[in-house]
């Protein structure tokens, strides 16, 4: 069959802005949650909360919208986390890139599973990332650090994930079907 050149209307500015907003939403929400967690409120465990929010956001969006959570975007979120946090530069970047890699690698299996299994896998990934961050920080600062903050970070991440996943799932569903939002 012969293909005839057709006339296609140009995409409107509103349509292009809508597509850009949908594409950037996962990165923007993760960055905004990271900034909100970094506000100086004087809460105990606020550094662990900040790292937990970044881990949960990157894991969730890498699992359910990997096209919008590219490694470069994860790198920039990790750089923001390093600039806002207390760890040596590069620790947050490396841990978030590894979390992203695990989520993308296991995506096909995990997206078909129930929430409890995804939560369990996230808790294991968050615990591994916390141990990695603790170890890298100890090596880069040449000090043996107490393991308590790493344990607290893993527990906060595991406890925070259901609430964040609920909010991010609602946002994800409204992105997928804007007419029902």
List where the protein language model places each region.
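Terminal, non-globular segments
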Residues: 1-181
């Amino acid at each position: 069959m012969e293909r005839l050149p057709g006339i296609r209307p140009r995409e409107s500015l509103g349509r292009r802005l809508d597509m850009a907003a949908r594409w950037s939403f996962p990165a923007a929400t993760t960055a905004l949650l990271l900034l909100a967690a970094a506000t100086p409120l004087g809460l105990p465990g606020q550094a662990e909360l900040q790292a937990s929010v970044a881990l949960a956001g990157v894991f969730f969006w890498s699992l359910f919208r990997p096209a919008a959570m590219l490694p470069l975007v994860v790198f920039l979120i990790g750089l923001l986390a390093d600039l806002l946090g207390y760890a040596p530069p590069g620790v947050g970047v490396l841990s978030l890139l590894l979390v992203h890699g695990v989520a993308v690698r296991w995506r096909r299996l995990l997206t078909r599973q129930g929430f409890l299994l995804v939560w369990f896998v996230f808790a294991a990934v968050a615990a591994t990332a916390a141990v990695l961050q603790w170890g890298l920080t100890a090596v880069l600062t040449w000090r043996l650090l107490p393991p308590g903050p790493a344990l607290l970070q893993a527990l906060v991440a595991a406890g925070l994930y259901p609430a964040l996943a609920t909010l991010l799932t609602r946002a994800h569903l409204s992105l997928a079907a804007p007419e029902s939002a």
